[in-house]
Amino acid sequence: MKPIVKQIVKPILVIGRHGQVSQALKATQPDCYQVDYLGREALDIRSSLRVAQVLDQRDYGLVINASGYTQVDAAETDSQAPFALNHLAVKALAGHCGKRGIRLIHLSSDYVFDGRQNKPYRPEDTPNPLSRYGESKWRGELAALEYGQGHTCIVRTSWLYSPFGHNFVKTMLTLMCQGKPLKVVDDQWGTPTSALALGQFIWQLIQVIKPEPIYHWSDLGVTSWYEFARQISDSANALGLLDEPANLSPISTQEYGAAAPRPHYSALDTIGSQGILPAKRWQDNLIQVLQQLAKEG
C-alpha cells in the first residue's frame, strides 16, 4: 500500500550546497518546488543564531540537512569537529525547526551500526557505532528526533557515490586510469548507493503526509568494497573510461590498517522505503553514474 501523499507548496531549504547529496538533489529536483541550496559560506549550522536568522527569512515548509562531517578516519583523532557538526549543530537545527513547525529531513549513515549481524539492518534496530564518526552520527539522530518535536525524519544511507564531489567511484576511476596496482578491502560488506537515486527518494519522501521517524535507503544488493571496485573496473572498461581492466587485489581490513574501525556488515533493510520509491540494483545505478561521467569527459 502506497503512503498518502501531499504537494509541498512552501519553499524548501537544503543545507550543504557543495556536498554530493545536495548536488544530487539539485540534479533530480522536480520543477514544482522552490528550493534554496545554502553552503557553509551562507549558513554554517554550527551557529545557532545564524540558523534562526535564515529560517526566519522565508516561510520554509521543509529543511533537508545534507551537511555533515564525513572524514571517518580523521574523526578518530579530532575530539571536537565531528560532534560539533554531526551532533550539536543538528540538535540546534532540529530545535529551531521544531519550534517553527518546520519539517526536517536529516541524513545519516550505516556506520551507526556495529556490523555484527549477518542480515540487513532495519530502521528499528539499535545502533552501536564502532567509530567516533558513527557515534557522532548516532548522537545527531537522537538529538534530531528529540528536539524536532515530531517534525524530524531520519534517512540512513550507505556507501554513497555520484558524479559529484569526492567518493569511492571517482577515486577508484582516477587511480585505475593511472594503471597502478590497487589493493581493496574484501571483508567489509554493504550496499553502494547512488546519490542520484537517494535524491529521487527524498523528493518522493517529502510528499508523504505521515512519514516514519527513520527510513533506510540504498540501492539493491550486497557486495564488498573489493567486488565494488571490480564492477567499477568492468563497467568503466566497457564504457571506454578505461583502456584496460584495473589491476586489483583483495586485502583484509586488518592489513589495510585504517584509523577508524568499520562495520563488517552494514547492509540496510529498505523494505519500508520501497513503497515510496522502488530501488534499483546497485550495478545498474553504477552504470548510469559512469555513463554520466563518460559524457562529461
Place the predicted regions along the sequence by residue.
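Rossmann-fold cofactor-recognition segment
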Residues: D36-L49
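NAD(P)H-binding glycine-rich loop region in Rossmannoid oxidoreductase-like domains
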Residues: S48-H87, G98
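Mid/C-terminal beta-alpha module of Rossmann-like enzyme folds, strongest
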Residues: F201, V208-A258
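NAD(P)-dependent short-chain dehydrogenase/reductase
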Residues: L142-G190, L196-W203
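Amphipathic terminal alpha-helices
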Residues: K280-G297
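SDR active-site strand-loop-helix element
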Residues: I15, L38, A66-S67, L104-S109, ...
